[in-house]
Amino acid sequence: MASTRDIRRRIKSVKNTRQITKAMELVAASKMKKAQQAALAGRPYAELMARMLAALADRVEEAHHPFLTKREVKTRGIILVTSDKGLAGPLNANLFKVVTDIKTPAKYAVIGRKGAQFIARTHRNLLADFTVTDRVAFAEVKVVAEFMVKQFLEGVVDTVEILWPRFRNTLVQVPTLLPLLPLSSVKDVIADLRSDAGGSAASAPGASDQQMIFEPDAETVLNALLPLYVNREIHQQVLDAKASEHSARMVAMKTAKDNATKLLGDLTLEYNKARQAAITQEILEIAAAQFSS
């Protein structure tokens, strides 16, 4: 049995660990809530863009935009969204499993240090790596979007996809691979935007397409909106990934805190037993000394 001094030292260490994990759990919960609110805040933008694209689609034929041009897929371009830090449970490991299962040639643009380290460690083709703060400012994500669009237009990659941990609920984050480019059609873009807007884009009052005037012409505006759609889509998924990251970290820290509490109880019991044994031993020694005298 360990000495009471060693057990006291372990109890102190576990108490400190429990305090740290509890603080990290609270911080992660706060950040998760903010990330969810930020993701929901993008709904009005998606709604308005869906209305505009619906109005444009009725006025022009399918635009001949490079984003709508399909070609033979030789190299996939994948935006991998991971966390910068660990202590997030299996969040990153689940994403890396999806990457490992990709057998076709692919080049990666990575958001998050953990992803960049994995791509380098496994000797995959890394185009660039980026860092995005917890605020997930649109300007930060726009840099990533413009970089990947450039790779697509120059023929470096034949598709652009994004792999991120989709937020389902506090306990569930699902690795999801979403195609971004080339776009299948304007109608599919509208359907996706309406889905993100909660299905309200088509029926909101005062949303008459006839009130919209497009300058210089409808086709020019449509071609300008498609890159904005790609930027917005990437921004939305990075926000979603941040919510997943903070949620996974909150759950991991809660589990660690609960385990520390259980361990603290076991150590306290062990300490009491050791202390009781030491007292009993002292009593026996005193009694033995009295009998011998």
Predicted feature residues:
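C-terminal beta-strand-loop-alpha-helix "lid" module of Rossmann-like NAD(P)-dependent dehydrogenases
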Residues: 1-293
